[in-house]
Curated annotation (Swiss-Prot):
The keyword Glycosyltransferase does not apply. One of the primary rRNA binding proteins, it binds directly to 16S rRNA where it nucleates assembly of the head domain of the 30S subunit. Is located at the subunit interface close to the decoding center, probably blocks exit of the E-site tRNA. The lineage of its organism: Bacteria, Pseudomonadati, Chlorobiota, Chlorobiia, Chlorobiales. Belongs to the universal ribosomal protein uS7 family. This is Small ribosomal subunit protein uS7. It comes from Pelodictyon phaeoclathratiforme (strain DSM 5477 / BU-1).
Length: 155
């Protein structure tokens, strides 16, 4: 049987010294263009620092991530010919990955401006518990709440 490979250790980003920011840069990256992704994220942080004078952009980012990351989600399980949506707790690593994905998707869907401006706007909205990515988290939580009756079918 093959040996199970562990997780790849991701270093910290060079400006903020934060592993979460480094993971977010990797999530924003397209086609292996890390320099472009890094510029987008750092420009978004600079826009946040400019618009919200006196607030640390890293704190705004952390607050936004805590408001976007889901605690529970529904997973499909087939039981006797019927498929049930079973609410499950989300692991910490998946929680962050979902938050990154939703933030990136809903920032990109905003109209008109550069990606850095759209990302900054979505981060600021998420920090204030608004924005499309927070709505997505609320929708996932609502689905889990609606299917609470099937929680005893856990995997």
């Amino acid at each position: 049987m093959p040996k199970k490979v562990g997780y790849k250790r991701i270093g910290v980003d060079f400006r903020y010294g934060d592993e979460s920011v480094a993971r977010f840069i990797n999530a924003v990256m397209l086609d292996g263009k890390k320099a472009v992704a890094t510029k987008i994220v750092y420009d978004a942080f600079a826009i946040i620092a400019e618009k919200l004078a006196g607030e640390d952009p890293l704190e705004v980012y952390r607050k936004a991530m805590s408001h976007i990351a889901p605690v529970v989600e529904v997973r499909s399980k087939r039981v006797g010919g019927a498929t049930y949506q079973i609410p499950m707790e989300v692991k910490a690593s998946r929680r962050g990955a979902l938050a990154f994905r939703w933030l990136k998707i809903y920032a990109a869907k905003r109209g008109g401006r550069s990606m850095a401006e759209k990302l900054a706007a979505e981060l600021m909205d998420a920090a204030n518990e608004q924005g499309a990515s927070v709505k997505k988290r609320d929708e996932v939580h609502r689905m889990a709440d609606a299917n609470k009756a099937f929680a005893h079918f856990r995997f």
